[in-house]
């Protein structure tokens, strides 16, 4: 009986110690001190190498520190332990994407989509999938993924990305429609689009559609050193004069 009580006491002490370490790691992660959180998470994993909380948090810390190799190792361990967990496949897809492994990222995101019916997670998956497909220059696939994302949520970034895909395909009318929709969505949510490439591509699309005044306004947002902004702005001014 005494031995059992002693053993139970040790277990409780161990649990309390782990809880303290988890709290300490959480505080550092919240404060974005990821390099300080990792040694604490290491201590937890020495005691229990399969601690899913510690593995996930350490993977996240490595990812924020742009150590994608180590981040992938931890999330891959979780996938081995829980092969039907869609979130883990999604997170590994994120890590692979950030590390430039776009085709592998696409594969993991597709697995996550197959495993989950959760609307929020599916929306995240489709947006990540759209970005990965775009990086692979699979513009039609990127358009489809953006369209799927927009069934779940409305965000200007999805319209911008789909607009960029249309732009790459030289479908300037559809690109312009998405760029204008992005502005409307951002305005509705009291956000501002400040990305130079957005206004450059929007201006190019307007120029291609014969909307010279609108294009001129967009090109004036950019400085002369951004791509061929000065040339396009001068072309707009010339076209506006010709139309008078």
Predicted region positions:
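Start-of-helix register in tetratricopeptide repeats
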Residues: 19, 53, 60, 87, ...
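Canonical tetratricopeptide repeat
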Residues: 57, 91, 124-128, 161, ...
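Alpha-helical segment of the N-proximal tetratricopeptide repeat
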Residues: 19-47, 57-60, 64
